[in-house]
Amino acid sequence: ITNNNNWNQVCNGGMIAASIAIAERDPELAASTIKRSLDGIPHALEEYGPDGVYPEGSTYWGYGTVFSVVTNAMLESSFGTDFGLGDYPAFKESALFRVLMNAPSGGYYNFADCGDARSSNGDITLAWFASKSGDEMYFERDRLLRSPSKIGRLRRLDGAGLVWLAQYEKTMESSLPTFWQGGGANPIAV
């Protein structure tokens, strides 16, 4: 799977999860599948370059990126490394893109085929970036740590975010730039 869109992240992440699950029973199959997926994922990660802009907009950033960060977490948990995927050029910088796409209306700045509705429960994918960077800008505390009665229905991978929230340790607090531009397949300026 070597396409350059979010389906790459979804499929290769799933193949890695399945391979980890069967590794004790069939280590050769697991190893070859993981290698193939590790070779394929960079094709999708290239789309974040050079500055973190995701060409399909913020909604698809959330969809594809959550599968990347879950995959990175699985690899770290199983092998002690994510094999460099989390440090792929412009991947970590893409968290700033996501934050900058939050419009004053409370929705997302809408471009490409991106929807504009934000989850009221906070951005669990940004929690991974907060845990890795220590930057409070990516920890949506007021949206992530609400009372259970206000949370409502969780999304498919929100449970993984509890680990990242537990791992978060504030080491820095950056602020939003007054001007930002990002290049790539769908350049933008904010």
Residue ranges and their predicted role:
Residues 1-57, 163-179:
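Active-site lining segments of carbohydrate-active enzymes
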